[in-house]
A protein has these predicted regions:
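Glycine-rich phosphate/diphosphate-binding loop of Rossmann-like nucleotide-binding domains
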Residues: 37-49, 56-74, 205-255
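Gly/Ser/Thr-rich loops at beta-strand to alpha-helix junctions
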Residues: 33-39, 118-131, 211-221, 242-244, ...
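Short Gly/Thr/Asp-enriched flexible loops that form oxyanion-binding sites at enzyme active sites
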Residues: 124-141, 222-225, 371-378
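A glycine- and small/hydrophobic-rich beta-loop-beta segment
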Residues: 267-344
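N-terminal phosphate-binding or glycine-rich loops at protein starts, especially the Walker A/P-loop
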Residues: 2-64, 119, 129-138, 142-147
Length: 427
């Protein structure tokens, strides 16, 4: 079955292996294909074992089966309800890989449940990276995940998603060992080995958990809110609302027991509606509403859409007011039309809410750009938004207005008090 002295063990309908060795050794799942990368795989195993790591090699090879892995291609196919001959007979790399991804994820979690993984290391090109990171993304935050990949220097969102995956650029093609790749692969192995040695499975906290989205332009408010809530013994997680940040917040809502959410920055919705760079997609904030998590919405950072360089901003959003944030990003001032689109969208989302929702609107400005010291200040817009959002929610949720700026202590205090009210009602 393999060359590492492990006894066979039946798990469900799939014959896996009983992994021997000192129980105190951290266990790392190594995902690598022996049919195309035998030399690199052996090198990574040696690097890990040299650090006192017990390696469990999962081999999702499709072309042919090579002896040596604890988890063979046949086991992976069987876990997906088929066999390797049927997988190969598909004669389509995408369809074949989908089967192997299903089996690999199932077996990885069975191994973790039985053995207790302390990390995952993988190496691959586009196909290997797609499969390995699908396994990594199925594991919770905190478990070390390192992907050595030829895809690491490009567009990595499809691979990383909202997870804590470390992408290591392979530099060269994964085609043998040379003076560069030896160092790169060893560094990747040592990285996951170090993390695995220090890994501790998370313990469930008894503290209330509040999630909050913000940008630098509403950071003053978020800092005041976070500090006040932490003084009350509440755990606060803050997310940067640049698209992936809000989507990560949504994912954590799905996976954890969240007490309340403060949506202090709705720029991801504004960008979704108007083609900005930081879109959170059509489902942003839907998770908390459908789950019934108490939620506070603030039109923070809705005074602008995030565009690219100033030339692009002029071309895409002509006739607007602009603030050059840096060479790569321009804030484009929103007006009544854009705010109306946001109010309509938010009203539709809130219509799906299964728990309490409150809206807080600061009448003196929505961000540091929308302030007397900023470049996009417009006091006429907050009252317009109040009318729009009040009409959109049609009395279903309260709309609170405060004649202060978003980045003031008074506004932060109001948000804190609302969160505490939610918590006390649940208790």
């Amino acid at each position: 079955m393999n060359n590492h002295g492990n006894a066979d063990k039946n798990w469900g309908n799939v014959q896996l292996v009983e992994f021997s060795g000192a129980s105190e050794k951290p266990k790392v799942l190594l995902i690598a294909t022996l049919d195309t990368k035998p030399t690199e795989t052996a090198y990574l195993r040696d690097c890990l074992e040299g650090q006192g790591i017990q390696v469990i090699h999962l081999d999702p090879s499709i072309r042919r089966t090579v002896a040596g892995a604890e988890i063979t291609p046949d086991m992976i196919a069987a876990a997906a309800g088929t066999n390797m001959q049927a997988v190969r007979d598909l004669r389509h790399e995408g369809k074949s890989q989908a089967v192997m991804m299903e089996g690999a994820q199932k077996l990885a979690h069975e191994i973790d449940a039985r053995e207790g993984l302390s990390g995952i290391l993988a190496i691959g090109g586009s196909m290997g990276t797609t499969l390995a990171t699908s396994v990594m993304r199925s594991f919770p935050y905190g478990l070390p995940k390192v992907m050595i990949s030829t895809m690491a220097s490009g567009f990595t969102t499809p691979f990383v998603g909202t997870r804590d995956i470390v992408m290591v650029n392979a530099v060269c093609d994964i085609a043998g060992l040379n003076t560069i790749t030896r160092d790169v692969y060893r560094n990747g192995a040592l990285a996951v080995a170090g993390m695995a040695k220090g890994y501790r499975r998370p313990e469930k906290s008894a503290r209330p958990l509040v999630l909050m989205g913000t940008l630098g332009t509403t950071e003053r408010c978020s800092v005041m809110v976070r500090s006040a809530l932490e003084r009350e013994g509440i755990e606060v997680m803050v997310f940067h609302t640049t698209g992936s940040g809000g989507q990560t917040l949504d994912q954590i809502v799905r996976e954890r027991d969240v007490t309340a959410v403060i949506e202090l920055s709705l720029v991801e919705m504004m960008d979704f509606l108007h083609g900005g760079l930081c879109s959170g997609g059509p489902d942003r904030a839907r998770a908390e509403l459908q789950k019934g998590v108490p939620t506070i919405f603030v039109p923070g950072n809705c005074d602008f859409v995030i565009a690219g360089p100033i030339e692009d901003a002029h071309a895409r959003f002509p006739g607007k007011r602009y603030h050059i944030h840096n060479a790569a990003l321009t804030a484009v001032r929103t007006e009544a039309v854009e705010l109306g689109h946001l109010a309509k969208h938010l009203g539709e989302l809130i219509g799906e809410a299964k728990g309490p929702v409150s809206i807080y609107v600061p009448l003196q400005g929505f961000s540091s750009h929308d302030s007397p010291e900023g470049h996009l200040h417009d006091l006429s817009m907050p009252p317009v938004f109040v009318k729009q959002i009040t009409a959109a929610v049609a009395g279903r949720v309260p709309v609170h207005t405060l004649d202060v700026h978003v980045n003031t202590q008074a506004f932060a205090d109001a948000l804190v008090q609302q969160v505490l009210t939610y918590i006390h009602k649940e208790a």
